Amino acid sequence: MDVADLRREYTRGGLHRADLPAEPLALFEKWLAQACEAKLTDPTAMVVGTVDADGQPWQRTVLLKHYDAEGMVFYTNMGSRKAHQLEGNPRISLLFPWHTLDRQVHVTGRVEKMSTFEVMKYFHSRPKDSQIAAWVSQQSTRISARGVLEAKFLELKQKFANGEVPLPSFWGGFRVRIDTVEFWQGGEHRLHDRFYYTREGEGWHIERLAP
């Protein structure tokens, strides 16, 4: 398949320096709300980038579960590839690809582990089947067939039918302490708007970048 001529124009309007808030999370929250209003599929989906011990980058899609002035939060199996990589190198990249709105947001920072209390509170807010699934999957390990997972799920669903699903010891979360945020808005003639927030002490420095 020849993909060289697959392209389109970006015509949704620009992003102007005068309209930017002092804090990047204020603009992120506005854009996220607009992504939800536009009924984008999985508006909280973000591409999480990590690096392994050999310097090889890895990416996968994870759902954002909370954000505030302290950072952005996601949960995962702590035995997973990404968790092991973050243990060795806490630097992380997050990308929110809101293509339908001609937008993307790129976040960089460092992770710290969530407390057991925070993890447990979120874990027990999940649908029960999702809690059971956390026990079933030893994420990133090799399995012989999907049937192995399905059989284990049915076994545990019966086991926990009449009681609470306990928090797995291998399940946890990370908070991303944000260092930089870049907002990208597609523009006509490929003259896109890019604004880059860098943390400086208690505030933020904002720069416009060439597209």
Curated annotation (Swiss-Prot):
Its cofactor is FMN. Substrate binds at R7, R8, E9, Y10, K65, Y122, R126, S130, R190, L191, H192. One of its GO terms (molecular function) is pyridoxamine phosphate oxidase activity. Pathway: Cofactor metabolism; pyridoxal 5'-phosphate salvage; pyridoxal 5'-phosphate from pyridoxamine 5'-phosphate: step 1/1; Cofactor metabolism; pyridoxal 5'-phosphate salvage; pyridoxal 5'-phosphate from pyridoxine 5'-phosphate: step 1/1. SUPFAM superfamilies: FMN-binding split barrel. GO terms for biological process: pyridoxine biosynthetic process. The keyword Transcription regulation does not apply. Keywords: Flavoprotein, FMN, Oxidoreductase, Pyridoxine biosynthesis. InterPro entries: Pyridox_Oxase, Pyridox_Oxase_CS, Pyridox_Oxase_N, Pyridoxamine_oxidase_dimer_C, Split_barrel_FMN-bd. It catalyses: pyridoxamine 5'-phosphate + O2 + H2O = pyridoxal 5'-phosphate + H2O2 + NH4(+); pyridoxine 5'-phosphate + O2 = pyridoxal 5'-phosphate + H2O2. Its EC number is 1.4.3.5. FMN binds at residues 60-65, 75-76, 81-82, 104, 139-140, 184, 194. Binds 1 FMN per subunit. It holds the Pfam family PNPOx_N. Belongs to the pyridoxamine 5'-phosphate oxidase family. Homodimer. Catalyzes the oxidation of either pyridoxine 5'-phosphate (PNP) or pyridoxamine 5'-phosphate (PMP) into pyridoxal 5'-phosphate (PLP). This is Pyridoxine/pyridoxamine 5'-phosphate oxidase. The gene is pdxH.
